[in-house]
Amino acid sequence: MYKFAIFLRKDAQPNFFRNIILSTLNNSYFDKYVLCSAFFQENKFSTSSEIISAVNSTRTVNIDIYGLYRGTWNKQFNQFCSNLKNYYQNSSCSTNFYKFKPNSHAKIFIARKKGLPLISIIGSSNLSAGAFADRTSKERWNQECDVVIWDDSDSSSKKIIENMLENIPGELKSFIYISNYDQTYISSDISCLDKINKLENLMKNNADIYPV
């Protein structure tokens, strides 16, 4: 059964978006990740360092990267992709890089096991510092709103979400919305699994291979 949660970031901590992604990347149960962001940052904050720290190079895993909304971020996106390629090039971890075609601005994360999408995030958050960095309330952070979808019948996925929900302060619980996915409400002929697969195919069709 698929469930979904809507997280409105009310303060710098806890950063639900960051915590779910890193917990999922750090879990060797998953064998494929899709990271789609308008911006990847490589300066004082390094998105690639966060990914590399979470995904051990000894794992057999595939990582697909989609990005580069604006040309002004080309240098940082190229550096991000180069860092990942160089780190994983002699490992069993494979990386694939894609550049958005014009007008694409999606922010999507998908974790798969044997082809099945088990945890997904569709949101407003990019993988840049304002949304993804581990920051305090005294530092600049972005107020974002993200939708998390997971297969609650999968024990590993369920545990990641449960662990995250257990650490939510009481004053923030009113900013979190959780529900079961109701397939009979709309588009009943398309399952949640199929919708996520269609979403990834749409991203791939609206992107070009990015040479690194």
Describe the residue ranges of each PLM region.
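PLD/PLD-like phosphodiesterase catalytic module centered on the HKD motif
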Residues: M1-V212
